[in-house]
């Protein structure tokens, strides 16, 4: 199955959600051209953590999950961003996500995968 996206489009995996791409699923640009030209790319996949998540006690349902098995992400500015992204700033309290891949291919992306720093706002007082 192929999903084509316009330049401003992105896939968002919210906390508690799972996106599973299997057996040849293709996420790609609707405009095939020069992969280094932003006009021909789409935004990619964002996998979000939870702002209220405590990194010492991560609950399996509190974070977004991306599972890729023999699938392709191509022609994206960032294939997978493991954070919630606000252009031009990032939200460092939305990390702590899960990305699992087997046979994943990132083709003609400006950046394949980006893991940003995670700021733990939980302070254990015990």
Which functions belong to the PLM regions below?
Residues 1-126:
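Extracellular beta-helix/beta-solenoid repeat scaffolds
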């Amino acid at each position: 199955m192929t999903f084509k996206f316009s330049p401003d489009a992105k896939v968002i995996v919210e906390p508690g959600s799972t996106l599973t791409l299997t057996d040849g699923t293709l996420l790609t640009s609707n405009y095939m051209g020069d992969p280094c030209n932003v006009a021909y790319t789409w935004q990619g996949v964002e996998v979000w953590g939870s702002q209220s998540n405590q990194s010492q006690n991560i609950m399996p349902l509190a974070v977004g999950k991306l599972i890729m098995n023999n699938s392709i992400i191509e022609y994206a500015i960032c294939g997978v961003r493991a954070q919630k992204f606000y252009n031009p700033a990032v939200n460092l309290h939305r990390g702590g996500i899960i990305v699992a891949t087997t046979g994943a291919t990132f083709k003609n992306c400006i950046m394949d995968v980006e893991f940003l720093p995670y700021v733990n706002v939980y302070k254990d007082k015990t």
